[in-house]
Amino acid sequence: MRIGRSVVLLGMGWWLVLSGMAQTRRVLGVMIAEYPPHSGWSSLHADNDWSLLRMSFLRQGFSDIRLCKDKEATYQGITTALRGLRESVNPGDTVWIHFSCHGQQMEDLDGDEPDGLDEALIPYDAQMYYEKGVYEGESHLRDDELHTYLTEIRKRLGGRGKLWVS
């Protein structure tokens, strides 16, 4: 009888651990309030956004809250954060990714856009103006690349998981 009770308790413990893991609520915030002066981009009110959003996420039970802010939110910083998020999610998790930064259209490189333009998010290290041989958009986060990250995260979440992007 004692062994049976121990097995049941152990099984319930594992079920609680696994079900808790399967329902983690995660947030990745990308917030850029101050771009470098030489970039050509104006300041935003991303700090206000984040303080309000963070309180809301905490009230809604989000426990894994990550922030990639200002100087950390370079192209490399954002893509590293997206890869880290992708690797940490489990089936059934809820993930919210929020961007508070500039955006810009730019020439479509692979011909998949009917209007000939890609949409791009503007990381901290992206320049506003194209200049051949100097800055050709290599630090812009294009919609095609973002789509790849979101698709990979969505696959890892499985059918019960949720992915929100704002």
Regions found by a protein language model. Give the residues of each.
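Glycine- and acidic-residue-enriched helix-capping/strand-helix junction motifs
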Residues: 36-51
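Cofactor-binding loop segments of dinucleotide-utilizing enzymes, especially the Rossmann-like FAD-
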Residues: 30-34, 70, 100
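Bacterial N-terminal signal peptides
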Residues: 7-19
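Acidic/histidine-rich, surface-exposed loop or edge segments in extracytoplasmic proteins
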Residues: 28-39, 60-63, 131
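Positively charged n-region of N-terminal signal peptides that target proteins for export
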Residues: 1-6
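Signal peptide-proximal N-terminal region
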Residues: 51-65
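Caspase-like (clan CD) cysteine peptidase catalytic core
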Residues: 22, 64, 75-100, 105-166
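Cleaved targeting-peptide boundary
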Residues: 21-29
